[in-house]
Design a protein with these regions (language model features):
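Long, hydrophobic N-terminal alpha-helical segment
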Residues: 1-37, 61
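Short, structured motif recognition centered on aromatic/hydrophobic residues
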Residues: 3, 20, 44, 51-54, ...
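Vicinal oxygen chelate
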Residues: 3-11, 42-45, 64-131
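Hydrophobic side chains in well-ordered alpha-helices
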Residues: 16-19, 87-91
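Intrinsic, low-complexity N-terminal interaction/targeting segments
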Residues: 34, 53-65, 98, 103-114
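C-terminal "cap" of GNAT-fold acetyltransferases
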Residues: 34-50
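Short, charged/polar surface micro-motifs in flexible loops or helix N-caps
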Residues: 47-51, 58-60, 84
């Protein structure tokens, strides 16, 4: 298992992207809309990991609810796993509360699933199937 990316919820990609581009000394490596999660994301490769900026595309998206509750900032930590479906079964059997019981498509068309913060010390954890 390794760190895949850190997700940061922002009110506006147009406002946040230039700040991160200046800080990182590079443009975003990718930008896309993830319809299922109702977000627009900009991804920056940083060493062996990534920073993902998330902007809600709908007021009822998880990112919009997160910003309304906690403001902009850390949204989730994503970890790469080899067998996502197997890891979800293992964690559920161990009593970890899952948001997603089955993998779904996320940014970059990767298979992802989220663990509930109630089981992970208050941090939203995303598991990403390692390619």
């Amino acid at each position: 298992m390794k760190l895949h990316h850190i997700g940061i919820a922002v009110e506006s990609l147009a406002a946040a992207r230039p700040v991160f581009e200046k800080m990182l000394g590079k443009s975003a490596d990718a930008e896309e809309v993830v319809e299922e999660q109702k977000v627009r994301v900009a991804m920056f490769q940083v060493g062996e990991s990534r920073l993902e900026l998330l902007e809600a595309t709908s007021e009822d998206s998880p990112a919009a609810r997160s910003i309304a509750k906690r403001g902009q900032g850390l949204h989730h930590v994503a970890l790469a796993v080899e067998d996502l479906a197997g890891k979800l079964r293992e964690l559920e059997n161990a009593g970890v509360r899952l948001i997603d019981r089955e993998p779904r498509r996320g940014a970059g068309n990767e298979l992802v699933a989220f663990l509930h913060p109630a089981s992970t010390a208050g941090v939203l954890i995303e598991l990403v199937e390692d390619k």
